[in-house]
Amino acid sequence: MRFLITNEVKSVFNDEIYLQRFEQIANLISIKLNIDKERFFECHFVDEKTIQEINRDYRNKDYITDVISFAFDDGEIITPLLGEMYICYQKVVNQAKEFGHSFERELCFLFTHGLLHLLGYDHIEVEEEKIMFGLQDEILNELNITRNVNGNKNG
């Protein structure tokens, strides 16, 4: 599975540092879920204003959120493009502090969460949530991306 990253945030954030982690996550999900390697998606890092506008305009929810995914598959027609996800940089920073773990862990969590939404996973129902969150934890733990403040199990 391939992806395109765009960084629309004017900050010191450099997504290139995390590109290797994103590749590891996408590859592991591809293997676990048997996703064709020709499928691809876009991930956009945006500011609070942009994500609130997207949330308001496309979801009728007028607030800042952390990640929004738009899956392009409708269940009948499968296209090479899985969809697009938008991650709010400032929410990554704030939530990492709030939850007491690293920026890397929060960023990778939201990337994984958004990608699973693109692949049809959801967490509206309790059973769906167990499956999706279980898979998220499995992926992140397998890659040693944990809730530890240093972002790994050993320190």
UniProtKB/Swiss-Prot annotation:
A molecular-function term among this protein's GO annotations: metalloendopeptidase activity
Keyword Endoplasmic reticulum (UniProt): no
Cofactor: Zn(2+)
Keywords attached to this entry: Cytoplasm, Endonuclease, Hydrolase, Metal-binding, Nuclease, Ribosome biogenesis, rRNA processing, Zinc
The keyword rRNA processing is annotated on this UniProt entry: yes
Localization annotation: Cytoplasm
Pfam families referenced in this protein's UniProt entry, alphabetically: YbeY
GO BP annotation list: rRNA processing
Cofactor mode of binding and number, as noted: Binds 1 zinc ion.
Residues annotated for Zn(2+) binding in this entry: 113, 117, 123
GO terms for cellular component: cytoplasm
Alphabetized Gene3D superfamilies for the sequence: Metalloproteases ('zincins'), catalytic domain (3.40.390.30)
EC number: 3.1.-.-
Similarity section: Belongs to the endoribonuclease YbeY family.
Record function comment: Single strand-specific metallo-endoribonuclease involved in late-stage 70S ribosome quality control and in maturation of the 3' terminus of the 16S rRNA.
HAMAP family noted in UniProt: Endoribonucl_YbeY (MF_00009)
Name under which the protein is recorded: Endoribonuclease YbeY
Organism: Ureaplasma urealyticum serovar 10 (strain ATCC 33699 / Western)
Record lineage: Bacteria, Bacillati, Mycoplasmatota, Mycoplasmoidales, Mycoplasmoidaceae
Gene field: ybeY
